[in-house]
UniProtKB/Swiss-Prot annotation:
Zn(2+) binds at C413, C416, C431, C437. GO terms for biological process: DNA repair; DNA replication. This is DNA ligase. Its cofactor is Mg(2+); Mn(2+). The active site is at K118. It comes from Pseudoalteromonas atlantica (strain T6c / ATCC BAA-1087). The lineage of its organism: Bacteria, Pseudomonadati, Pseudomonadota, Gammaproteobacteria, Alteromonadales. Pfam families: BRCT, DNA_ligase_aden, DNA_ligase_OB, DNA_ligase_ZBD, HHH_2, HHH_5. HAMAP family: DNA_ligase_A (MF_01588).
Length: 677
């Protein structure tokens, strides 16, 4: 009987029982007790914890009601990047996706794909250590997200402790946080009763709920989490499955919820059959989806296929056909972007399309206006391409009013009145004003200070706009001349914020050549291209002096990008900006040339597993790479050596089975010493 147990024993008993009920309800979709019995147990649990606060544990079901509010979200760096997916919009895209895979793997046989609905919510990473939830984070930019642990702990179907005993000691689960349609309706009814603004759609409601600083608010929102993949995995107690679908089944055994519509199919044809089936079920599902995700099911194939800069080669999101509605074009305004691009923006009669109200849509350029034959006053068809980006795809010619007006493209910049030029072969017209143009200046400054560029903490978009409007900043180097006194007088600043900003600007002066190149905003030079340029040329001076042939010798730099880089460094005002930044103290460490084929471990594949005591995992990986080795995350027949730390797990077993060379940490350190000696 329960009264024969101590409070601690009874509490453990109740927690285990409630966790089992949650598993039956959320994972197996098979509730075994009435709500009244569940509620009775929760009340008893709360009574015991209130009377014995020392017995309250972090993984107690009571912790799902939320704790103290936060002042801000901390940043979290993903140990394994959370990449996005490439998209397919039609059957040809899917067939091409399968062909790319077969060509790369050099196979002709059918490929097994794991198929699941693409949930329309917010991507989240949840880290478990020794079975206990220790951290949750948003995707962010894929490398750095926000710590939302306290909020995720309140989600009803997220286990605070994993079931069973055979899970890895560190296990990162990735999935989507969503809100059901019924939950969304209930939430909006409550919002309206409180006199608050209702949410536009379930996705926005879910995202807004997760980013509440007060977890009690999140706890009151009807959120659910569904797992779709693994991220970081360390110290496996039992081997993970050799397919994506079997690994998801393991997650389910450990208490993590999965989509009920998961299937494994053979080849692109069956994938398309699954896509059409889910499309027909779409309106019957309890939650919003915007497509289907297909992943190569075989993990070894995934590893061989690898990744491109932003997405895996072995997965694709097949989006549903865009949703369309009719609206009226009220006006066209012309916006100026960071690179001077003049973009016509359609102002529309607000129209509800695919879950959101659309009042603006891009018309891209003059060529698109001509193609559509569009006039102000026309009735137009709006499409949300990929359920995201509003586009005007056609006009309804027989509804054109008598007073419809032609759209007149400006001859001079609508912001600074500089001349507009349109180069031969380009569809985009551009303002020639450069940093003289306030619109370009604002966007260029935002780019310069952004996280992927110089990463100036506290220098947000609104403050940059204020600084440009006040003419305190006309060039990037002006940031480093800002004084505390004038900054303190700006809206929402104050002396403390001004001091922090000046210190952050000083800190940002130490950067890398790649980040500096990216910060300059050279057309079509993203992070990866900037990194390739830096590693190839080693110095800024070498890049400045490079001709077109030399630039095209850089990995991933073609004719067009080479021309943009070449032109940028031939413009005198760009060189003046660079000179001013260097004079202000912006600097970076010298880059050593990587002669990979001459390095001692060139061409060798290493795998790290288990716990290292002298060097941490990242340091060991960096050291191996500096010696020319490729460091892989999994053991295969192509592996040359496995470095096995403590509690090595299944990778060690697999390496031994394959006859792969195995060394311990001491062996690795001795090797490093020999190679450097």
């Amino acid at each position: 009987m329960s009264n024969a147990l101590s409070p601690a024993q009874r509490l453990t008993q109740i927690i285990n029982t409630i966790n089992e009920y949650n598993y039956q309800y959320y994972v197996q979709d098979n509730p075994s007790v009435p709500d009244a019995e569940y509620d009775r147990l929760m009340r008893e649990l709360l009574d015991i914890e209130n009377n014995h606060p020392d017995l309250r544990s972090p993984d107690s079901p009571s912790q799902k009601v939320g704790g103290a509010a936060l002042s801000a979200f901390e940043q979290v760096e993903h140990e394994v990047p959370m990449l996005s997916l490439d998209n397919a919009f039609d059957e040809d895209d899917m067939q091409a996706f399968e062909k790319r895979i077969k060509d790369r793997l050099k196979i002709s046989s059918e490929i097994s794909f794991s198929c699941e609905p693409k949930l329309d919510g917010l991507a989240v990473s949840i880290l478990y250590e020794n079975g206990q939830l220790v951290r949750a984070a948003t995707r962010g930019d894929g490398r750095v997200g926000e710590n939302i642990t306290t909020n995720v702990r309140t989600i009803a179907n997220v286990p605070l402790r994993l079931r069973g005993e055979n899970f890895p000691s560190r296990l990162e689960v990735r999935g989507e946080v969503i809100m059901t349609r019924a939950g969304f309706v209930t939430l909006n009814e409550a919002q309206i009763k409180k006199g608050k603004k209702p949410f536009v759609n379930p996705r926005n409601a879910a995202a807004g709920s997760l980013r509440q600083l007060d977890p009690k608010i999140t706890a009151a929102r009807p959120l659910l989490f569904y797992s779709y993949s693994l991220g970081l995995v360390e110290n496996e107690q039992q081997p993970l499955g050799e397919t994506h679908s079997s690994r998801l089944a393991q997650l389910s055994e450990w208490g993590l919820p999965l989509s009920k519509e998961l299937e494994v199919t053979q080849g692109a044809t069956q994938c398309l059959t699954y896509f059409h089936k889910i499309g027909e079920l779409r309106s019957q599902l309890s939650y919003d989806i915007d497509g289907v995700v297909f992943k190569v099911d075989n993990i070894a194939m995934q590893q061989e296929l690898g990744f491109v800069a932003r997405a895996p080669r072995w997965a694709i999101a097949h989006k549903f056909p865009a949703q369309e509605e009719m609206s009226t074009l009220l006006d066209v305004e012309f916006q100026v972007g960071r690179t001077g691009a003049i973009t016509p923006v359609a102002r529309l009669e607000p129209t509800f399309v695919g879950g959101v109200t659309v009042s603006n849509a891009t018309l891209h350029n003059q060529d698109e206006i001509n193609r559509l034959g569009i006039k102000i006053g026309d009735s137009v068809i709006i499409r949300r391409a990929g359920d995201v980006i509003p586009q005007i795809v056609a006009i309804v010619a027989d509804k054109r009013p008598d007073d419809a007006k032609d759209i007149v493209f400006p001859e001079s910049c609508p912001v600074c009145d500089s001349a507009i030029e349109k180069l031969e072969g380009e569809a985009v017209a551009r303002c020639t004003g450069g940093l003289y143009c306030k619109a370009q200046r604002k966007e260029a400054m935002k780019h310069f200070a952004s996280r992927k560029a110089l990463d100036v903490d506290g220098l947000g978009d609104k403050l940059i706009e204020q600084l440009v409007d006040a003419e305190m900043v006309k060039s990037p180097a002006d940031f480093f001349a800002l004084d505390i006194a004038p900054l303190s007088s700006m809206e929402r600043m104050g002396e403390k914020s001004a001091v922090n900003l000046v210190n952050a600007l000083e800190k940002s002066k130490k950067t890398t050549l790649a980040k500096f190149l990216y910060s300059l905003g050279i057309r079509e030079v993203g992070e990866a291209t900037a990194q390739n340029l830096a590693q190839h040329f080693l110095t800024l001076e070498a890049i400045e002096q490079a001709d077109l042939d030399a630039l095209q010798a850089v990995s991933d730099v073609g004719v067009i990008v080479a021309q943009h880089v070449f032109n940028f460094f031939k413009e005198e005002h760009n060189l003046e900006v660079i000179s001013a930044l260097l004079e202000a103290g912006v600097h970076w460490p010298k880059i050593e040339k990587l002669a990979l084929d001459e390095l001692p471990l060139a061409g060798q594949v290493y795998v790290l597993t288990g716990t290292l005591n002298v060097m941490d995992r990242n340091s060991a990986k960096a050291k191996l790479q500096s010696l020319g080795a490729k460091v892989s995350g999994s053991v295969s027949a192509k592996t040359d050596c496995l470095v096995a730390g403590e509690k090595a797990g299944s990778k060690l077993t697999k390496a031994q089975d394959l006859g792969v060379k195995v060394m311990n940490e001491d062996d690795m350190l001795a090797m490093f010493a020999d190679l450097e000696g």
